[in-house]
């Protein structure tokens, strides 16, 4: 049967992960995302995880699927061992917030942009991204879902970290949705369509991003970690 939003929120709170996704196959694969504290409109990695479950447990013959989210249709294609997710492009808009964002990150920021959900702070090099120790309380005062910090990469085209205390996640391990903004930005700066990206959280992760006319395709892999029943 269906479960209501309040129950979804309680389950996400108990799971205590960045986001928990809920798929309703009776409603044409409607998908909902909850952080431990709030419903969010889009979560890329929870979409990839949901697609993995869909292809391996719900429809084993399918090679693509569409999830209906608060942010519109999210298409995922199965390509051998990888999953390719299509997200709407998120165009960065330059904002004059360097001082406030530098203060929140405890480092010198070169430029600041705003996407649909997040602020994007560009710093001088990848080493700064890896070593910053931000002020989470100051980031929580920003009027955004999260704050992305990024620089040109060494082994990859760009590196990033994502902080989201406003949605109950001090630092997200890997953030698919942030790459709709990151890939759009770096694609223009580096004049590239296809890029390898690294998120430098403690757990870390690498993604392949391809910038198309209206969408960003993000390629990643998923593994089954846990299977069970929830009683509520």
Where are these predicted regions, by residue range?
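Active-site proximal loop and beta-alpha junction motif in alpha/beta enzyme cores
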Residues: 1-42, 48-232
């Amino acid at each position: 049967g269906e479960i209501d939003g309040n129950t979804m929120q309680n389950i996400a709170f108990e799971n205590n992960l960045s986001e928990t996704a809920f798929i309703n196959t009776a409603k044409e694969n409607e998908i909902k995302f909850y952080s431990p504290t709030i419903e969010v409109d889009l979560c890329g990695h929870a979409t990839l995880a949901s697609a993995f479950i869909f292809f391996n447990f719900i429809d084993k013959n399918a090679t693509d699927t569409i999830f209906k989210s608060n942010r519109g249709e999210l298409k995922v294609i199965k390509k051998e061992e990888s999953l390719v997710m299509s997200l709407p492009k998120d165009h960065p808009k330059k904002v004059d917030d360097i001082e406030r964002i530098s203060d929140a990150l405890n480092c010198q920021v070169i430029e600041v942009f705003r996407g649909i959900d997040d602020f994007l702070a560009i710093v001088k090099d990848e080493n700064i991204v890896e070593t910053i120790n931000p002020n989470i309380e100051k980031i929580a005062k920003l009027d955004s879902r999260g704050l992305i910090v990024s620089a040109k990469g060494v082994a990859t085209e760009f590196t990033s970290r994502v902080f989201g205390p406003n949605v109950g996640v001090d630092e997200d391990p890997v953030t698919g949705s942030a790459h709709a903004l990151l890939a759009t930005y770096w694609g223009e700066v580096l004049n590239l369509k296809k890029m390898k990206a690294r998120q430098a959280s403690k757990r870390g992760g690498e993604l392949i991003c391809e910038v198309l006319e209206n969408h960003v395709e993000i390629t990643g892999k998923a593994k089954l970690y846990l299977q069970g029943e929830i009683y509520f």
